[in-house]
Amino acid sequence: MRGIDVTEAERILCGVLADLFAIPEVGPQDGFVRLGGDSIIAVQVVGAARRAGLRITVRDVLTLPDVAALAAAARPLARSARPGGDDGVGPVRPTPVMHWLDERGGPADRYYQYLVVRTPAGLTGQSAAEVLQALLDRHDMLLVIRDGSGWRTRPAGSVRAAECLRRVATEGREATAEEVGREVRAARDRLSVGGGVIVQAVWFDAGAGLPGALALVVNHVVVDGISWRVLTGDLARAWEAVAAGRAPAGALDPVATSFRRWSELLAAEAAGERTAAEAPYWNGVVRPGAGIAGRRPLDPARDHEDRAGHLALSLPAATAGPLLTSVADRLGADANEVLLTGLSLALARWRPCGPEVLVELEGHGREDIAAEADLSRTVGWFTTLFPTRFALDGLGAADAEDGGPTAAEALRRVREQLRAIPRKGIGYGLLRHLDPVVGKELAAAEPAGLGFNYLGRLGGPGGGDWQLLPAHGARLDAPGPGMPMAHAVEVSAYVLESADGPVLHADWAWADGVHDEAEVRALAEGWFRMLGALVVHADRTGPAAWSTLPSAVPPASGLTLDAIGQDELDDLAASLGLL
């Protein structure tokens, strides 16, 4: 027995998706990818569905064709509290990404993220403090401290919001970019993990009856992209309660699994058989021969983030909109796969690259490794870092520029490579940082020369209270002065809504002296050209042809793709005009 009415499940899930995509209506036949969804939003969908009493998985959200199918897969969920004794308070085991930060070196106090949101016209100093206090007391990791015994979280009430909040009067006007930048840097300099100063907030008060702005500056060790979505949602709910004269704490949903508990689950997983079985795979990925040629090796003593070169480019909504919605759906791929296909095509034309390239990818890290874990509302740094090896040989053909068949070959390779990664890459960090034997083997390998991070969609359409202010935006990877670069070239991509639709932004950084601006600009502009070529190719070939690509087809009963030779697959693709 299913135990749940499909129509009711459809109603719930349509409402969840409409809220997350900030659109008036979603119907049962609408598909998650067609709406512009990605794995980060999928985690939010799962969390919102849980709060409404439905159990679905991230895989369901990403692979099922529409809301009707997702509703049919949903199961009723019994509400449960945290496991006994898990109040989130106490020692926190260092997770793989926390070990990675320690190895990287530099001033961890200033490794921060920030986000600037609009504040409502009725906000006062007292109500701002009440809203902020509700966040501090709800989310354990905002109260973390690192002392001589290691990391530990403190009880609710240990940090007073008034001590974290600064008011800046702007006297009837919006804060300028210079004012916001100056205050964010000053807030960054006040952060101290040893002193337990993890959060700083700056309220730009335009005066009575006028909307203002709030800059939240948080040490990166306790926050990531999904955490920010949790925090901004809680800001809005806490304010609604305060404005109505209610206690804000009661307006915030409970957190099912604490970060402290998650750190224990990761340690147990690192010692398990599933993780040990991945060692040959990861040793194969990091084998020699996939480096990026630079003028010299990356030097942590001089290649610091504050000395890096920077380049910011934007892909207009006319291309980014279809690329991340209808085209991704038509290609049978998610946004990350489409973006990395374009990057592979660009890398194949980039002088420093050979026939293979090692790229370090970032994942959201909230993977399904334990049945008890519900991380949809947990604030913390869950990011997984893992290397991926892309084959570039043959992808430099000229036809790719015009959306020719090389684009299909690139997508096939990238999609199959990414889908072959065990457990979305979480095992690499467990082995690299929590396994004393395999960790040494992986540490000895040459690191990836390129880092890629897709942060997904940030904020809604803008303009509303507690929503991202595009004029000031956010920075979700902001190492402070003296932090060594992790890669010779790095790119962070994210999507912001505009009046014309979604715009893809790409922030590039490089170690000056290893590469120069002309080299990086050539790669950055080539990437955007190849993304445009994928739009052209998808329009040219149509959805029926793309859906037959090998990695887009789930195995039928009694038949697996392992039984089909590559020559046969190539013949099939050629018959459909893909090769």
Residue ranges and their predicted role:
Residues M1-D109, Q126, E130, T257-S258, ...:
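Regions immediately C-terminal to embedded phosphopantetheine-bearing carrier domains
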Residues E10, P120-L143, L216-G233, G309-G354, ...:
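Acyl activation and transfer enzymes in specialized metabolism, enriched
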Residues Q44, R51, Q133, V199-R260, ...:
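Active-site-proximal acidic secondary-structure segment that organizes catalysis
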Residues T57-R59, H139, L143, T232-G233, ...:
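Extended, hydrophobic beta-loop-alpha segments that form or line the acyl/peptidyl-thioester binding
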Residues R75-P107, A129-A175, V197, R237, ...:
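Short amphipathic alpha-helices and their capping loops
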Residues G105-Y112, A129, D140-M141, V193, ...:
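His-Asp-centered acyl/peptidyl-transfer active-site segments
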Residues A121-D137, R152-G195, G233, A279, ...:
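A short, small/polar-residue-rich loop/turn motif at beta-strand boundaries
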